[in-house]
Amino acid sequence: MSGGGPIYIHKMSADGTRLLDDGQKVYEGPVAEGTKLFKKDGYYYISIPEGGVGSGWQTVMRSKDIYGPYESKRVLEMGVTKVNGPHQGALVDTPEGEWWFYHFQSADPQGRVVHLQPVVWEDGFPVIGMDYDKNEVGEPMKVCKKPSIECNVTPHAPQSSDDFASDKLALQWQFNHNPANENWSL
């Protein structure tokens, strides 16, 4: 699959190292990027973040045939929340059978803040987050339960202060993109 605008499905070599055809266009929409393809219950699903980071939404399409035709549904948008974008995420399922959608929002100097939203399936499409404004499109939840997974990880609060005693920056000093190391020192 490829495309940052139109979405194409390609045949690939068995080892996944090269394309074997020019691809078949299966969708064209506004600023489609970060597309994901998966199969569930006999359907091919294409998850597409559309419309750009600031005001975008998440579309999910499904078809019994990988080349379509596809049914399309907007499944997540900013709506009445303050989470812009909900953008460039992915649907994931846990070993316990729960479904989740992780995505980011653009938070200017804080960079791209990651969110995790609960998912339920209704009529063959994911319902992501909560439909606060009752328009049949999910919206990001500010607070939700955490995934019910078996895990032996001790939770840690984020570090919020630094005495700069180390020769390396602590985790709270992560950079939005590529750090300009020449602009700081310890």
Report residues per predicted region.
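Carbohydrate-active catalytic/glycan-binding domains of CAZyme proteins
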Residues: 1-186
